[in-house]
Each structure stands twice: as structure tokens, then as C-alpha cells.
Amino acid sequence: MNRANRVVRGIWLFGFIACLASNAASNEAVAERPNVIVVMTDDQGYPELSVHGNPVLQTPHLDSLHDESLRLTDYHVAPMCTPTRGQLLTGIDAARNGAINVSSGRALLRPEIPTIANYFGDAGYATGVFGKWHLGANYPFRPQDRGFQESVWYPSSSIPSVPSYWGNDYFDDVYIHNGTEEQFSGY
């Protein structure tokens, strides 16, 4: 097993252990359980945050999250968005989880593999995903089929700057909210 696979499995194992620990502590008040929020940006590198020393880009809200949160500092991404997302959600390398590309049917997680949302949901957490999904737009690949109780997502790899099939162009776009197309207002 190469180093990258060990790192991905370590991240997944950490999340799984956190779920088990929170489940074991279910006698404690729910308010004492930690909130778990995973922020994954698309096509943003490590040096593109002001907290990491970028002299041009100012990212005060992300810097605040950085300062107040647990950070996974040794997670290695794939050269494309879909394999990276699949690895984070399953803890399994893209070559084994099925999401190895961004097109041609190779952007689908194997349905028998549970996601981190399944484990957190089983531990009593509310789960949600918001934003780009690009891991399948039909059953059994949609967020609501993969353990997410709440979802607002876009069923493609990007929102183009010219209107798409849905008329999306970053303003007043149509997203899929818990399985139903819904018009949203704003940017």
C-alpha cells in the first residue's frame, strides 16, 4: 500500500473512529458532541489562503475556520476533482472506489461502499452536502442515496459562465434540493 493510500485510509479511519466515539458517548448531552463540517474547495491550492502567507488573496473567513478547527494537514488529492471527492467520502483510493475520472461513467462511487455520511448518520449526526457533487446524478449515486439527509447540489462538473441546460450561470441558478429541481436566488 503506497503512502497516499495509507493517508486516505487514515483520514477515513479517523472519521470512523470519531463516529464510534460520539456514538459511545451518546449518554452525554447532544450539545457536547462536536460539530463536524468538512469544507472542500474546488481547484484551490494550499498557498491560496492568506493564513498560509498569500500576500495578495485575502480570505478572512477561511482563515478564521483554519484558526478554530482541526485541520487534516496530510491529505493528498487526485489531479481531478471527482476522484478526490470520492476518496474523501469513502476513505478508499479512487482506483478501488470507482470514481476514477470526471466522465464516461467513471465518476460514480461503487454503490456498495458506504460513505462518511452513512457512518455519521448511523452515529446520530445530521448529514448534508451542499454544492458540487459530480459523483452521479441518478439512483443509486445521488447524495440522498449515499447517506446525506439534506442536499443542495449541482449535477455536473461545473457551472459555466454562459448559461447551461438549466440556464445556470452563477446567478439565480437551479439546483437539486433533496431530489427536486429548485430555483435559488442570488449568487
Model-derived regions: residue spans:
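Bacterial N-terminal signal peptides that target proteins for export
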Residues: M1-W12
